[in-house]
């Protein structure tokens, strides 16, 4: 086999005399050499245009490859070699042996079988989507394989984009289904190593893993040199190289394009990751250079030098949370160029919403000669005021900051000795100039961004590239694209769909972009909760207290809970404190199977642009279907044109209450609330009367049709805003049709109540009432 020497790369490395290949790895790492062979196996399968004939899919080479590995002497190699048009070795799971190197020769591919049964840990456990759990063997496994290796200029293709035998889905289809459904996919990883001291990967090309490409655990001494990983960016959970609980790791001269972390350090409670060098590499699509999300074993003495990241979702990232955190320190990123990256720099101990006592602490983090050439989101977060992020920015430049987002809090940032233009400010962020600081100069990056290297000697078999999924996925456990809904909204484009996994998201949302959808695939809306505890008193008034504020048009929400729990978190304050769950002033908004929880002033549905005297109001329309709204005083209020279809309206404990406080200002305003086929329920044991509404403005308009009313509804139904002081009830339009239940007492209703005829009811059907000049009919909207 011809052995190339990477002469040009080594010459380039001389430019970086500050980092020999000792670096943080305590070993002296030199370019590997392929061992002599104990046996050479020849391929028996052809694959014209990358397609293996169905008959050949049964002709596995697993047994002969495994026999060769089992019988090869330590220090030697099993070589897989093509012969003529036959260049494919087809295999199920393989087990490496100590001291033995598997070599895939140039123009040869070691291909994974598409039969999921070969990878079962238990019968039927692999190739499925289900609850959390792992059900697959890796394609290549090594435990106790000291001084072994995987080398060669050929490729290992795990065929993540090929349909499974007997099925119509690919491995990657399963991964996408799991992401959408917030489930776990059981798919095989490509290479899994444990206790693999002195293991080396050299020149090999890895393609299309269904799961992680390389994971290394409990190992002292691992080298990946000249490795190429090429997997589509749309293939979920396909990490490149993941060192976990290991030390003395070098990843050098490698090129990685994948659908998840390009390189990710993953310590766990067993041990940390230390003494690692990532040198002279190029990352393309993926999630960048990451540490975490578990850091409870600790990370120290990491050097990342001469790295380009082009087109990834993330750049340099440390991520963890208090449920699995630990100390990350003595980490240096030097001579790094980043462009076309959504999140160029991310340092967060709040990667998920999980709580715990394993605190993620980041200190002695150094960025030296780092240049970010395009806008993105920058995150510099400490855990809290007592556990700040400690980071030094030495000659760090970020272009186009005016179009970037910054999330900075609880950080101690040192600038220099070379001053760049990045100095993140924020709440409880201190910035200190290093002694002797001088103006810096941006790192020159043009020559550092290079095309992905040629894969001419590394064949690829046919498969389907997963389509681009433009949805944004939010998961409280960190398995999505974001752990925060608002962070997703910050980067969302008009028309995007935000898929929120079950969990509790304690935050405040502002939706100011058109055509946004927020939904969960779990039909139990109580499982996906967006909650906060803002109040009118603490936030400048009722209309500034909302957990969710929607000002943009064409908003859609489904299968979620929107809650303001101010009274629960402040039990010492009066129960009547005004605290909104939702404020909606956007037009053509739809809420389906959404729970709105609060007490006083739960849901504000209003028009916009009104002057103080109620003039110039721009009407807005909202449609609420199959939803649940809880509160006690004026908990559905405002002056929009809103329709509540098949909703449950729940009155919570309070000394009296009012469901609506509609606020139509004048007879000409296009405004009113309609409730149709709803149920009016109440907390058990509540005896105080509840009214259907009172008029916040003189021309309040509310209609209840076909509604089942509990006994808590006062027989009068409606009441003046302040009896004896205000006189709006004389000009309101309060109406009912076909009310049922013990609360429906037409003969005792306030005399201002109108009782509709069947003919009059027609004008209050949603397709008529909400039509507007654009003929909007929310009941005919396509299923989201």
Ranges and model annotations:
Residues 42, 49-50, 146-147, 257, ...:
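Sequence-level preference for short, compositionally simple segments enriched
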Residues 54, 66-91, 96, 100-113, ...:
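Glycine-rich repeat segments that build the extracellular carbohydrate-interaction surface of secreted
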Residues 57-64, 103-186, 203-206, 253, ...:
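Right-handed parallel beta-helix/beta-spiral solenoid domain characteristic of secreted/periplasmic
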Residues 65-71, 88-98, 102, 203, ...:
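Short, T/G/N/S-enriched strand-turn elements that build extracellular solenoid repeat scaffolds
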Residues 76, 86, 92, 98-100, ...:
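The right-handed parallel beta-helix/beta-solenoid scaffold, focusing on the short coil/turn
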Residues 76, 91, 112-115, 159-163, ...:
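Short glycine/acidic-rich loop motifs that flank beta-strands on beta-rich extracellular proteins
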Residues 81-83, 97, 103-105, 111-113, ...:
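Feature marks extracellular polysaccharide-active and adherence modules
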Residues 93, 147-282, 506, 554-650:
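Right-handed parallel beta-helix
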């Amino acid at each position: 086999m011809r052995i190339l020497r990477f002469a040009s790369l080594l010459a380039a490395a001389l430019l970086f005399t500050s980092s020999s290949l000792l670096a943080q790895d305590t070993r002296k790492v030199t370019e590997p050499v392929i061992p002599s062979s104990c046996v050479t196996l020849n391929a028996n399968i052809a694959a014209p245009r990358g397609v293996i004939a169905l008959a050949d899919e049964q002709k596995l080479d697993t047994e002969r490859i495994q026999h060769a590995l089992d019988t090869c002497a330590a220090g030697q190699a099993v070589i897989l070699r093509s012969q003529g048009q036959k260049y494919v070795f087809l295999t199920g799971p393989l087990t490496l042996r100590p001291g033995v190197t598997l070599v895939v020769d140039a123009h040869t591919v070691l291909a994974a079988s598409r039969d999921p049964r070969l990878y079962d840990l238990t019968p039927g456990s692999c190739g499925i989507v289900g609850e959390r759990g792992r059900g697959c063997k890796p394609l290549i496994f090594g435990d106790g394989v000291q001084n072994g290796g995987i080398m060669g200029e050929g490729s290992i293709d795990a065929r993540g984009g090929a349909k499974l035998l007997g099925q119509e889905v690919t491995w990657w289809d399963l991964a996408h289904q799991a992401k959408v459904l917030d489930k776990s996919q059981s798919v095989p990883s490509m290479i899994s190593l444990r206790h693999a001291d002195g293991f080396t990967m050299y020149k090999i090309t890895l393609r299309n893993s269904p799961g992680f490409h390389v994971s290394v655990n409990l190992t002292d001494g691992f080298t990946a040199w000249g490795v190429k990983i090429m997997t589509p960016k749309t293939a979920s959970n396909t990490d490149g190289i993941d060192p976990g609980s290991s030390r003395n790791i070098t990843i050098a001269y490698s090129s990685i394009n994948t659908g998840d972390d390009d390189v990710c350090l993953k310590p766990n409670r067993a041990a940390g990751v230390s003494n690692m060098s990532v040198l002279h590499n190029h990352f393309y699509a993926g999630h960048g250079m990451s540490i975490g999300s578990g850091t409870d074993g600790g990370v120290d003495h990491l050097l990342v030098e001469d790295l380009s990241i082009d087109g990834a979702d993330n750049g340099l990232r440390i991520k963890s949370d208090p449920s699995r955190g630990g100390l990350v320190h003595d980490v240096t990123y030097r001579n790094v160029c980043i462009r076309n990256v959504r999140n160029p720099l991310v340092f967060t101990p709040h990667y998920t919403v999980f709580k715990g006592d394993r605190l993620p602490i980041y200190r002695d983090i150094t960025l030296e000669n780092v240049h970010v050439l395009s806008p993105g989101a920058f995150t510099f977060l400490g855990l809290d005021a007592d556990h700040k992020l400690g980071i030094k920015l030495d000659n760090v430049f970020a272009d186009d900051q005016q179009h970037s987002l910054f999330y900075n809090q609880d950080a101690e940032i040192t600038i220099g000795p070379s001053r760049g233009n990045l100095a993140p400010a924020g709440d409880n962020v201190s910035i200190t100039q290093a002694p002797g600081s001088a103006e810096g100069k941006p790192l020159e990056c043009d020559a550092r961004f290079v095309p992905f290297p040629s894969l001419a000697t590394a064949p690829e078999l046919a498969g389907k590239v997963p389509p681009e999924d433009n949805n944004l996925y939010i998961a409280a456990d960190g398995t999505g694209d974001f752990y925060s809904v608002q962070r997703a909204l910050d980067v969302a484009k008009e028309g995007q769909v935000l898929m929120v996994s079950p969990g509790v998201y304690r935050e405040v949302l502002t939706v100011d972009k058109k055509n946004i959808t927020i939904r969960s695939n779990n039909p139990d809306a109580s499982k996906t909760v967006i909650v906060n505890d803002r109040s009118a008193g603490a936030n400048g008034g009722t209309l500034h207290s909302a957990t969710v504020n929607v000002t943009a048009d064409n908003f859609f929400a489904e299968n979620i809970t929107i809650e303001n729990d101010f009274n629960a978190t402040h039990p010492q304050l009066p129960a009547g404190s005004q605290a909104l769950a939702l404020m909606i002033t956007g037009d053509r908004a739809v809420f389906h199977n959404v729970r709105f929880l609060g007490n006083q002033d739960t849901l504000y549905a209003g028009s916009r642009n009104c002057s103080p005297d109620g003039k110039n109001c721009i009407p807005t329309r909202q449609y609420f279907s199959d939803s649940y709204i809880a509160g006690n005083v004026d908990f559905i209020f405002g002056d929009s044109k809103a329709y509540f279809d098949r909703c449950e309206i729940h009155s919570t404990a309070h000394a009296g209450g009012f469901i609506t406080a509609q606020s139509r200002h004048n007879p000409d305003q296009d405004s009113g609330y309609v409730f149709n086929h709803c149920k009016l329920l109440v907390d058990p044991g509540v005896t105080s009367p509840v009214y259907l509404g009172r008029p916040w403005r003189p021309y309040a308009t509310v209609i209840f049709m076909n509604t089942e009313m509990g006994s808590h509804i006062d027989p009068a139904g409606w009441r003046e805003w302040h009896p004896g002081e205000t006189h709006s009830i004389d000009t309101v339009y309060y109406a009912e049709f076909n009310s049922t239940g013990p609360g429906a007492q037409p003969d005792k209703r306030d005399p201002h109540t109108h009782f509709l005829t069947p003919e009059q009811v027609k004008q209050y059907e949603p397709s008529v009432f909400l039509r507007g000049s654009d003929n909007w009919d929310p009941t005919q909207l396509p299923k989201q």
